Amino acid sequence: MEYAQQLFGDFFGPEWGPALFLLVKNVLLIVAIVLPLMLAVAYLTFAERKIIGYMQLRVGPNRVTFFGIPWLGGWAQPIADAVKAVMKEIIIPSGANKVLFVLAPILTFAPALAAWAVIPFSPDVVLADINAGLLYILAMTSMGVYGIIIAGWASNSKYAFLGAMRSAAQVVSYELAMGFALVCVLMMSQSLNLGDIVKGQQGASMLNWYLIPLFPMFLVYFISGVAETNRAPFDVAEGESEIVAGFHVEYSGMAFTVFFLAEYSNMILVAMLASIIFLGGWLPPVNVAPFTLVPGFIWLILKASFLLFCFLWFRATFPRYRYDQIMRLGWKVFIPITLVWIVVLGLVMQLPASIRGAFPLNLWFH
């Protein structure tokens, strides 16, 4: 990296060299994040259909293959779906606000991509290593709901507008619980930097991870993440049995696809962030060989993959909650639990080190 920076300085001069090097570096990092993310989203849809198919005692997609190879049956399905979506027409209803109708999917997808800027894949692999990384992600994930509200209003449809209102209320309700759960992580790590949060979980084994002292907060965060991404059993914003398809009922073609790109990108983001702040990020479960020989980003991907499997497991297992049940869970269960845990955590942190040493609390409170 230093050699490349020096090369840019020699070729473009000391005035333009460093700036151009930084520009090229950031563009390459963005491409290195966005392209694998889009591929991961495509094959997450395939994995969802296959896994839920097996859970329901059926096969799932098994026809579309590469070059007619039988044992790769189904693996080309995401590519076929993408080609079909690109070729379909985007139909705009006659009574819709055309500008906002087209803009809404972009406003939903852009924050879902922007949030990935601060995700650390290993100690040195992060696009923007900022001190307020956790706060930045919370802000980006909150902005996606504006696109959903605009989509519901611009569609000029009662079904779409009702779905958008449901989604807005749901996101506001669970954003509070998620924020309070992240406050507990902030109190323990004393930092909003995601890299520092992972380093605060370093130790001999997974006993040092924040999952153990903050297990209720992990459950609150993860379930709130499922609710924020409008996934089953919290998918009342799309409730097919009640309001046809919710806020994207009038969308087709690539505009419809962009909403799902945002949804699945946010799913992967929630799983990645939970792995970083509760499951040690790139740290191995045991700090001995052969676990330490595995690259850190592999551990991060494995942890996130398990949490993504839980997303799919929920969809195949639980029926959809009623709207009032979702609101009750957020306001009367999750928010009080997180507030109590913040108070308890604050009291424990004020205990003298000698008292904390009598219990295994010094594993997490340094």
Swiss-Prot record:
- One GO CC term, this protein: plasma membrane
Keyword flag tRNA processing? no
Q: Please list the GO biological process terms of this entry.
A: aerobic respiration
Q: How does it sit in the membrane?
A: Multi-pass membrane protein
Record keywords: Cell inner membrane, Cell membrane, Membrane, NAD, Quinone, Translocase, Transmembrane, Transmembrane helix, Ubiquinone
> What's the EC number here?
7.1.1.-
- Catalysed reactions, semicolon-separated: a quinone + NADH + 5 H(+)(in) = a quinol + NAD(+) + 4 H(+)(out)
Does the keyword NAD belong to this entry?
yes
Q: Transmembrane region positions?
A: 27-47, 99-119, 134-154, 168-188, 206-226, 268-288, 294-314, 333-353
Molecular functions per Gene Ontology:
NADH dehydrogenase activity; oxidoreductase activity, acting on NAD(P)H, quinone or similar compound as acceptor; quinone binding
What subcellular compartments does it reside in?
Cell inner membrane
Q: Which family does it belong to?
A: Belongs to the complex I subunit 1 family.
User: Which NCBIfam families does this one have?
Assistant: PRK06076.1-2
Task: Indicate the quaternary assembly.
Answer: NDH-1 is composed of 14 different subunits. Subunits NuoA, H, J, K, L, M, N constitute the membrane sector of the complex.
UniProt-listed PANTHER family: NADH DEHYDROGENASE SUBUNIT 1 (PTHR11432), NADH-UBIQUINONE OXIDOREDUCTASE CHAIN 1 (PTHR11432:SF3)
Q: What does this protein do?
A: NDH-1 shuttles electrons from NADH, via FMN and iron-sulfur (Fe-S) centers, to quinones in the respiratory chain. The immediate electron acceptor for the enzyme in this species is believed to be ubiquinone. Couples the redox reaction to proton translocation (for every two electrons transferred, four hydrogen ions are translocated across the cytoplasmic membrane), and thus conserves the redox energy in a proton gradient. This subunit may bind ubiquinone.
Stated name of the protein? NADH-quinone oxidoreductase subunit H 2
Recorded source organism is: Nitrosospira multiformis (strain ATCC 25196 / NCIMB 11849 / C 71)
What are the leading ranks of the lineage?
A: Bacteria, Pseudomonadati, Pseudomonadota, Betaproteobacteria, Nitrosomonadales
Q: Which gene encodes it?
A: nuoH2
